[in-house]
């Protein structure tokens, strides 16, 4: 059996009743990964040996009947540290980096008995929105292999959508969980900033980065967030966990809930079929008893410009350490210290990473700091205030996750600005540190359309409640790409 059509709770029951063992489930998952890998390129490293050792230990200790994730396989994005498993951030710069520790999110998952089966492909150093900037080649969309899977958590999304794994971890700096979740028709959540520790995450934009879960359904997504969320002394920005169980409101009705629909999220640049899908979703929420009203987020149009100044500035600082001396790939053709620095970084980083380092260095440079970085910080505050005004009167915000469905591979690589605009609707959530989820809401041109729900800080359980209500009464999550297959 492949088990890829079984939910986490169904797998848990099979494990507890000993109809299958953790080792058998892990072996089946590894076969699922290998059989689809040539078509998708969603993994950088398949950790077969380590996964089977973990599974054997769990079988010997016995499945924890009270812990639904005990013995469940997990794929981890390649910028999240895993003890003894290559963690390259999909870059030549870190081609041979093998951490000697687990990121806190991974350690938390392992404590719950989860088994790390591999590291997923991604845009290099999480910089990119298409899954194409990886040193190890582009990941393909699970629904159409000629389309991008979204990014930067491309492999994590494609792996879940295709049935390679049931659960995976990604990171989200400007939409890197939600956009690939939308393009692949699965559920992806970017938690409130600080909910999941960043310790062990290879830094891109430290004021924006957040680790989060991918899953085929809302409840399974919440179960994984339960496992990884924690306050952590190793991350000074981590927050106390305010919600004991993120699934606590799933199944409750949403009558009387007020949902805002920003007019800016359905304006210029939004594909007409995507817009129609979201408007239909808004009507569906009204049928479920929610009140949906149009609002304005006037400064959201500046989000992309603000983000690319702030994120690139933070990246230029964070990536200084990769110089061939302290960390990272060292060029062999260097004859002096200056050449080691220049050649190692020139050869070790890809084009998109170098583009963002240069933009960030420029934004922070003397004479330009006030005009760019400082100004971006001021506009970021205005974006935050826009959200606060809306959340004073509304429970959640509704909109599309991305302006379009997945586009052709290699179609935007020569137009960075056009690719950056694909994150237009997800970026403001990171700038404000808010939680946001993408769930399947329909199809356009045979490709999934993602619906985004945004809440005030620490409102994940409400987001899950509303997302689950939509999921339960629509069924879009039940539609699967051809590559998914079914139980044998």
UniProtKB/Swiss-Prot annotation:
Heterotrimer of A, B and C subunits. Allows the formation of correctly charged Gln-tRNA(Gln) through the transamidation of misacylated Glu-tRNA(Gln) in organisms which lack glutaminyl-tRNA synthetase. The reaction takes place in the presence of glutamine and ATP through an activated gamma-phospho-Glu-tRNA(Gln). The keyword Nucleotide-binding applies. Keywords: ATP-binding, Ligase, Nucleotide-binding, Protein biosynthesis. PROSITE patterns: AMIDASES. Signal peptide: none annotated. This is Glutamyl-tRNA(Gln) amidotransferase subunit A. GO terms for cellular component: glutamyl-tRNA(Gln) amidotransferase complex. The active site is at residues 77, 152, 176.
């Amino acid at each position: 059996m492949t088990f890829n059509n079984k939910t986490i709770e169904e797998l848990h029951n099979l494990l507890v009743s000993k109809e299958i063992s953790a080792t058998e489930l892990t072996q089946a998952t590894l076969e699922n990964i290998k059989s689809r890998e040539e078509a998708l390129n969603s993994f950088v490293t398949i950790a077969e040996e380590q996964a089977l050792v973990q599974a054997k230990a769990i079988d010997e200790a016995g499945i924890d009947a009270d812990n639904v994730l005990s013995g469940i396989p997990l794929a981890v994005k390649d910028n999240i540290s895993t003890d003894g498993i290559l963690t390259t951030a999909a870059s030549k710069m870190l081609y041979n980096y093998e951490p000697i520790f687990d990121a806190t999110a991974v350690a938390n998952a392992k404590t719950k008995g989860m088994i790390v089966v591999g590291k997923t492909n991604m845009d290099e150093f999480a910089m990119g929105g298409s899954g194409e900037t990886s040193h190890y080649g582009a990941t393909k969309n699970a629904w159409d292999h000629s389309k991008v899977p979204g990014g930067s958590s491309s492999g994590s999304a494609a792996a879940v959508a295709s049935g390679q794994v049931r659960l995976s971890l990604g990171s989200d700096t400007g939409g890197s969980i939600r956009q690939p979740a939308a393009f692949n028709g699965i559920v992806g959540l970017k938690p409130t900033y600080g909910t999941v520790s960043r310790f062990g995450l290879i830094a891109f934009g430290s004021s924006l980065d957040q680790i989060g879960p991918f899953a085929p359904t809302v409840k399974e997504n919440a179960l994984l967030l339960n496992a990884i969320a924690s306050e952590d002394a190793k991350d000074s920005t981590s927050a106390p966990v305010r919600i004991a169980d993120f699934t606590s409101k799933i199944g409750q009705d949403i009558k009387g809930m007020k949902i805002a629909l920003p007019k800016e999220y359905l304006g210029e640049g939004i594909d007409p079929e995507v817009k129609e899908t979201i408007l239909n979703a808004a009507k569906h929420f009204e049928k479920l008893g929610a009140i949906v009203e149009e609002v304005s987020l006037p400064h959201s149009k500046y989000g992309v410009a603000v983000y690319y100044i702030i994120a690139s500035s933070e990246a230029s600082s964070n990536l200084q350490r990769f110089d061939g001396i302290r960390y990272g790939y060292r060029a062999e053709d260097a004859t002096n210290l200056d050449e080691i620095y220049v050649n190692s970084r020139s050869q070790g980083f890809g084009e998109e990473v170098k583009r963002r380092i240069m933009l960030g260095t420029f934004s922070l440079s003397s004479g330009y700091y006030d005009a760019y970085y400082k100004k971006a910080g001021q506009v970021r505050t205005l974006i935050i205030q826009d959200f606060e005004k809306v959340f004073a009167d509304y429970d959640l915000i509704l909109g599309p996750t991305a302006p379009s469905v997945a586009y052709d591979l290699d179609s935007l690589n020569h137009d960075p600005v056009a690719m950056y605009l694909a994150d237009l609707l997800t970026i403001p959530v990171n700038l404000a540190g808010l939680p946001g989820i993408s769930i399947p809401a329909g199809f356009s041109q045979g490709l999934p359309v993602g619906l985004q729900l945004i809440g005030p800080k620490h409102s994940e359980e409400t987001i899950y409640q509303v997302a689950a209500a939509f999921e339960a009464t629509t069924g879009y999550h039940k539609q699967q790409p051809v590559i998914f297959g079914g139980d044998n």
